[in-house]
């Protein structure tokens, strides 16, 4: 269902600018991923609070469980006092005891300016330090003893993506270098590009950036190609972001009609309201302000999230935190009604994007055939009720797992762009749209629209401008996104100068400015002087938010450094475990075990002394290197193995040296 290329020309005046509009919509099929090499392409849902990875194999999607057996992984990274890096459940589980070195919510910072209001608001709520570096927010964290680093949101996200990559590799038994990565539909260019940079740092070539609601629609629609055309509304309310997309699905073609949302609304905002409620309650009851106590807030945050989840199936829960501060325990009830009251305005805020998306799609409520819920926050009964009421009692579709739908759809898209399609995915086509209007500033600060919101992508549109002063030799192109008529009310994406224009009366030069949005939703802008042929071109990602090639290379180096450090920690832990297993095995064999009665006094005393010395050495050497543990194991084996071998030979046994603690035991462990 490729769209034919069409050109439209219009002539009009923008203040003191002369403009000719050239409209071009590229064929949707022209952007099929060329493929970044061989190998399996995986689908990754990089979430604010949880991430998920899937692969399409043997005619169906497989959501891959992590090493803990869980199909979703917390998007958390931590650095311990011993210099170990933790990712996922391990990081989240120790957060209350290590708040300043546990990082989360990177998705709320990625691609943003440090000065953004959302960043400034989040900084007050996060227990770790967020600082300004080159106009971008960075996390200041001690990664190991005295080694303090400034980590960009891209680097933190890359650590989570790398864990998703490792999870897939362990499952597939092969190296993975290609992925489809999802982003909120309302992510802007800077946020999309920053997400691609994070994947690059993680060692992944991004075959496609896919909007999360579109991915969920793929998850809903796969296998239903013969069901006839349907209009589907995807309501995606996750941990940190909110999207609404309206799609027309017909015979394998998924056409996004409209999208809307809020990149800073989700389950964490609901948790924060509950936390603020209990912080105030503690202030009233105990006269103590814990708002600045990172450890107390860490404990409270975890319990408030648990309570929120429980209230989706219960009408009342008890919020209990042992030793919240100074030995004082918190044990208070929280009803579903109170939870809904605390978040009432936020819940109702989700309906505005629904109304806007429906209006942009030019559909009535009765035109929607299915409502697909995505994101853990859609389990909240009040959210479902508001959505049900808006659509006149229509029940949402229950066939898609809200936690896994986005990764499921990403895996389908990964199969498509990887070229390994089957009869289920071969004819699937995704036609997505731009979420916001794109334009540039003209005389007087007026916004000149080049690409209206909800324009199908990929697309390219061009417009002719001229100078507004006599003999003007340089023009500045300022690129904005937003729906307001004046650029001061919209978001500046980037700017560049086109110099070397031949001096001429104002209005005479012809300067063609072209906007091009690719299938990933990333905008490129070019400007060319038709008289001289001079041109400039940039990929918009916000100059003050754009990650340079040098920065990416540095981050790649640090990622390898962290990976090496992780490997050393694993090897050190393995060596210590081997030593401990041998010590415990020998002890069990000698003290009350089968060998106890077969040893003479001198042999038993010698082995027991060696074991006791090893116990003491282990207690005093918690963090030595792999080599020290291996050397200590060799020393202990040199003492114990000959004795135990001799005992077995005397007793007619045939076990080889070392079986008393034996190599088999510690290999299995």
UniProtKB/Swiss-Prot annotation:
Its main location: endoplasmic reticulum. GO terms for biological process: chaperone cofactor-dependent protein refolding; endoplasmic reticulum unfolded protein response; ERAD pathway; protein refolding. The keyword Glycoprotein applies. Pfam families: HSP70. Keywords: ATP-binding, Chaperone, Endoplasmic reticulum, Glycoprotein, Nucleotide-binding, Signal, Stress response. GO terms for molecular function: ATP binding; ATP hydrolysis activity; ATP-dependent protein folding chaperone; heat shock protein binding; protein folding chaperone. It is found in: Endoplasmic reticulum. Glycans are attached at residue 423. Induction: By dithiothreitol-induced endoplasmic reticulum (ER) stress response. Induced by tunicamycin-induced ER stress response. InterPro entries: ATPase_NBD, BIP_NBD, Heat_shock_70_CS, HSP70_C_sf, HSP70_peptide-bd_sf, Hsp_70_fam. Functions as a chaperone during endoplasmic reticulum (ER) stress response. This is Heat shock 70 kDa protein BIP3. The gene is BIP3.
